[in-house]
Amino acid sequence: MKDKRKGAGGRKSPVLYIVMLSVWSLLCAAIWYYFVPAFITPPFAAGTGGNLALRIFAVVLLVLNALFISYFWLNGVKDFLYVMWYTFSRRKLEAKYRKVLETDVRSVSDKVLMLYCTCNDFDGESLRRSMRQTYAHAETVILDDSSQPEYKEKVDAFARETGVRVVRRADRKGFKAGNINHFLQSEEVRRSDYGYVVILDSDEIIPPDFIVSCLRYFYAYENVGIVQANHVATRNRNFFMKLFHIGVNSHWPTYQTMKHNYGFSSMLGHGAMIRRECYEQAGGFPDLVAEDLCLSIEMR
C-alpha cells in the first residue's frame, strides 16, 4: 500500500484559550478589586490591638485566599468553556474525523504487539476478549511483574491454554514503564519488524476493531505518534459507580476532543496504540510514576 499520508492537525487555534484567559482575567480583576482594600486597611484591624505580627499574618491569609480562589476559578472557567465550546462546535469538530473513517487499511500488514501489563491483578477474561481482534497481524504478549504465586499460576495457565507469550524480569525497576521498556528495548524485539504497540491494563477490554480503527489514524496522518482511545466505565457495581460513570464517560470525549483541537493531548496510560518510531525516538517510557504523561511530553 503506497503511503500517501499527510500531517494532521496543523497549527492549532489559540482562540479558545484567549477567551478562557480573558474571562478568567475579568473574574480575577473583580476579586482583587475587592481584596486589595482589605490588604491595605484590614476590616478587622481594630480588633488586633495594634499587634503588627497579627495584622501581617491576617493579610498573608487574605492574599493566599485570593490566590487560591483565582486558581480554582481558572480551572472552573476552563471546564465550563470546554463543555460549552464542545457543545456548540461539535459538528464542525467531528467533521475532521471523516478523513480517518474513509481511510482504507484492509491491505495493511504491519505487525502490532499487544502488551498486557499485569502485577498481581491478572484478569484472563478481559485479556481473552481484548485478543479477539479483527486485525490478523497482531501478537499478544503478557508482561508479568506479579510477585504472588497465585497470579503467576493464573498467567501460566492462560498462556498454556492460548499460546500467548509471557515475559518476566528479575526485578520491578521502573514499575510499569520499566516493564514495557524491558521488553521493547530487548535485543530480540529491537531486531523484529513490529510497527506499533498497543498498551493494555489488566482489567481493560478493547473492542474487536480497536487495532483497525487506530491504524486508520496512523495511515490518514503521518505525524500521529499515539492514538489514545476514550475509556468507558462498564463494571458499575453500586449506585455511586453507576452515577459517577455518567460523568466519567461524558468527560473523555469532551475533554480529549478539546485538548486535541486546541491544546495538548496526552496518553492516558492504557487503551492506546503507539507508533514504533515515535517510541524509539522518545527513548522509551521515562521511569516515572506518570509514565504516560511523560512519554507524551517527550514525543511532543
Task: Label each region the model flagged.
Residues 110-113, 139, 294:
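Cell-envelope/extracellular polymer assembly enzymes that use nucleotide-activated donors
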Residues 1-106:
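N-terminal membrane-anchoring/stem segments of glycan-assembly enzymes
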Residues 159-160, 168-196, 208-289, 300:
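Long helical/loop segments within the catalytic core of UDP-sugar-dependent glycosyltransferases
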Residues 128-137:
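Short, acidic, metal-binding catalytic loop of nucleotide-sugar glycosyltransferases
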Residues 289-295:
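Acidic donor-binding loop at a coil-to-helix junction in glycosyltransferase catalytic cores
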Residues 136, 144-154, 170-173:
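A conserved acidic beta->alpha catalytic loop
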Residues 112-120, 133, 217:
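A conserved hydrophobic helix/loop-capping motif in glycosyltransferases and polysaccharide synthases
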